[in-house]
């Protein structure tokens, strides 16, 4: 992982940072502060990202934030926001609400497609001082983020009949499977579980499973198993400690990650992010629907 990060690290260190007021206090041997794109978002998003800003300031972290006001009711992500993320490589984002009904598409999905953020990673684990029903929970949910039911391919065939397409490709399935197994290998994880519904969606989820199985053969030191998504949810709430790394298609990963986060202490305190080779958008697992009282 260090070798892979070296070109990006050299690129960030070589950037000329314009002079500006920052909260960071230089220390001997430190380089220039790094810019991070900040999207406070909707609902409790500004509260969560604001807390992160306070932590960064208190620890004198070598970063400063380029803040943008983006909200879920906008028609599109502003180009300057995308340019900032491409430039800075790292973005801290609060939740963006997705309005119900037609007219406005999800800005979260737009971000994933524009930047090809194909992997969503959520780490759900017990936190000291936060009592939960289950102990020894340490689950990493890795979700394919660019296709499946979230492809946005919907249309009305005739009045009163809507067709929604689920797209699964071998390329994206293999890509997310490789990411999951590589993550497990690099982080000393012992098992990868593929979540599916191939007993019903035999072609779509069948292709996802076939891709996972092919990738699994290249990692003989990591145990691989499969579980149907409805049984997975039942097992999560009854015996979550049996899971390690979970790899899922898009929709299932959304449900599984939120369930696992709730078991481990709540969606507001579990770290997560969407990543590719060059960009990373870090967020908590909460929904923007959780509004402050």
Language-model features: where?
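Short coil/turn connectors at secondary-structure junctions
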Residues: 31-35, 61, 86-88, 116-117, ...
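N-terminal glycine-rich phosphate/adenylate-binding segment common to multiple enzyme folds
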Residues: 73-166, 251-255
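N-terminal beta-loop-helix "entrance" segment that forms/cooperates
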Residues: 60-82, 234-236
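Glycine-rich phosphate/diphosphate-binding loop of Rossmann-like nucleotide-binding domains
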Residues: 31, 37-53, 158-230, 242
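Buried hydrophobic positions in well-ordered alpha/beta secondary-structure cores of metabolic enzymes
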Residues: 42-45, 89, 142, 180, ...
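Short, acidic/small-residue loops that bind anionic groups at enzyme active sites
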Residues: 112-126, 218-227, 269-283
């Amino acid at each position: 992982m260090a070798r892979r990060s070296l070109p990006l690290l050299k690129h960030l260190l070589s950037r000329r940072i314009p002079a500006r007021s920052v909260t960071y206090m230089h220390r001997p041997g430190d380089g220039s502060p790094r810019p991070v794109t900040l999207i406070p978002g909707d609902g409790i998003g500004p509260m969560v990202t604001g807390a992160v800003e306070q932590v960064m300031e208190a620890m004198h972290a070598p970063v400063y934030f380029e803040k943008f006001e983006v909200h879920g009711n906008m028609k599109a992500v502003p180009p300057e926001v995308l340019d900032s993320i491409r430039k800075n490589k790292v973005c801290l984002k609060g939740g963006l609400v997705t309005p119900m009904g037609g007219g406005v598409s999800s800005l979260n999905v737009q971000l994933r497609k524009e930047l090809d953020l194909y992997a969503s990673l959520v780490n759900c684990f017990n936190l000291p001082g936060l009592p939960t029903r289950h102990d020894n929970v340490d689950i990493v949910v890795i979700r394919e983020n660019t296709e499946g039911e979230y492809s946005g391919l919907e249309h009305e065939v005739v009045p009163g009949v809507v067709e929604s397409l689920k797209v699964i490709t071998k390329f994206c399935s293999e890509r997310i499977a490789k990411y999951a197994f590589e993550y497990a290998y690099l982080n000393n994880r012992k098992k990868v579980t593929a979540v599916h519904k191939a007993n019903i969606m035999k072609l779509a989820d069948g292709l996802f499973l076939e891709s996972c199985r092919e990738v699994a053969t290249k990692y003989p030191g990591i145990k691989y198993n499969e579980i149907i998504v409805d049984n997975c949810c039942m097992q999560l709430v009854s015996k979550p400690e049996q899971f390690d790394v979970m790899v899922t298609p898009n929709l299932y990963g959304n449900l599984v990650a939120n369930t696992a986060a709730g078991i481990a202490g709540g969606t507001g305190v579990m770290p997560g992010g969407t990543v590719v080779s060059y960009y990373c958008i870090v967020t908590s697992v909460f929904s923007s629907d959780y509004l402050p009282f």
